[in-house]
């Protein structure tokens, strides 16, 4: 499999879908959004974007399977696309310009290709395993911040699982007191890419799904970040927790997360 050649095709499919989303946002109204679950919105834009992505990706890799947020299930195979057609739907619905397309390719349990396109800013992040990370064709690296007190931290809040709310509050209090600040962007894929290019220095969140992190985590890793689950292991893709930072900060940053959150399986 020539991943470099495949990446070129994926970037094109994602860019075309991003243009569709930008066009639809101009005429989009709140009434077009539907409630998928507690605090969880979906729209025809999510669904149509997923259809466009699936169609384009199947043309590139006909033998692939799919795991996608809006329900596309083509049976898991040796090569599987993990897709969020519109990460940050609530931002999109409310006109907040931070939402992204996330496409990761999994091979035998490992993410080997990732593309995240932040639609409103028209920024496309990408990576392949052992190939570095890029933003609009330029190589990117994580920041070099050495001290927690000089760092900017990104996180997300739970929308339908509040079992670890005390952990959320514990971590927030610590980082509010001991960093430059906390940013809650509202799209995990964008958070991870912001880490990859040095806009933030660390990211953590719990209760995530594979399509939230598949592409962004690979991009962050290829940009030099350390990425683990909350236990410090490799279960971030399916384990529903993720923490990531530049290597210099990781020891102290991860200690805060592990002290704040308890009773994690």
Residue ranges and their predicted role:
Residues 1-86, 226, 234, 248, ...:
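N-terminal subdomain of lithium-sensitive/metallo-dependent phosphomonoesterases centered on the IMPase/IPPase/PAP
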Residues 10, 14-17, 114, 133, ...:
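Small-residue (primarily alanine) positions within well-ordered alpha-helices
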Residues 21, 46, 57, 89, ...:
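Residue-level signal for inorganic ion chemistry
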Residues 28, 99, 127-131, 221, ...:
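A short, compositionally biased
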Residues 34, 74-75, 108, 126, ...:
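Solvent-exposed alpha-helices and their adjacent loops that cap or buttress functional pockets
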Residues 76-134:
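DPxDG-like acidic metal-binding loop motif
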Residues 112, 139-142:
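Short, isolated positions in well-ordered beta-strands
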Residues 141-265:
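An extended, acidic
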